[in-house]
Amino acid sequence: MLNDLKIEELLDKVDSRYGLVVATAKRARQINEYTATLGLNESLGIPGPQVHTRSQHPLTIAIEELRAGKLKVGFREPAREAAEPAGEAPEEQQRAAGEREDQGAA
């Protein structure tokens, strides 16, 4: 089924090649975890394969799910607060650095 696959078909569903790789790899890990914990899946909340396929390879299953429209891909922007160092805001850090320089010059 993947022999006739063209990457352009999948890029219509994802923003970039990088996004395609990340999304299918993450889903393949989920499918792998699903098969490793067969029987406990309901309690763990791990979804099984969403398409009927002859393949047993998690990455192939993930690509087929994306191709069938069963895999929704979205990326979240990192929170601005998480990008800044914990504690002081940038203005406070600059002010503190200036005070340290003043103390060193005295």
Curated annotation (Swiss-Prot):
Record EC number: 2.7.7.6
Assembly and interaction partners: The RNAP catalytic core consists of 2 alpha, 1 beta, 1 beta' and 1 omega subunit. When a sigma factor is associated with the core the holoenzyme is formed, which can initiate transcription.
Protein name: DNA-directed RNA polymerase subunit omega
SMART domains (alphabetical): RNA_pol_Rpb6 (SM01409)
PANTHER family: DNA-DIRECTED RNA POLYMERASE SUBUNIT OMEGA
Entry function: Promotes RNA polymerase assembly. Latches the N- and C-terminal regions of the beta' subunit thereby facilitating its interaction with the beta and alpha subunits.
Stretches with biased composition (Basic and acidic residues): 92-106
Assigned keywords, A-Z: DNA-directed RNA polymerase, Nucleotidyltransferase, Transcription, Transferase
Naturally occurring in which organism (per UniProt): Rubrobacter xylanophilus (strain DSM 9941 / JCM 11954 / NBRC 16129 / PRD-1)
Single GO cellular component term: DNA-directed RNA polymerase complex
Ranges for region Disordered: 76-106
Stored NCBIfam families: rpoZ (TIGR00690)
Enzyme class, spelled out: transferase
Family, per entry: Belongs to the RNA polymerase subunit omega family.
Annotated catalysed reactions: RNA(n) + a ribonucleoside 5'-triphosphate = RNA(n+1) + diphosphate
Entry's Gene Ontology BP terms: DNA-templated transcription
Domain of life: Bacteria
InterPro entries in the record: DNA-dir_RNA_pol_omega, Pol_omega/Rpo6/RPB6, RPB6/omega-like_sf
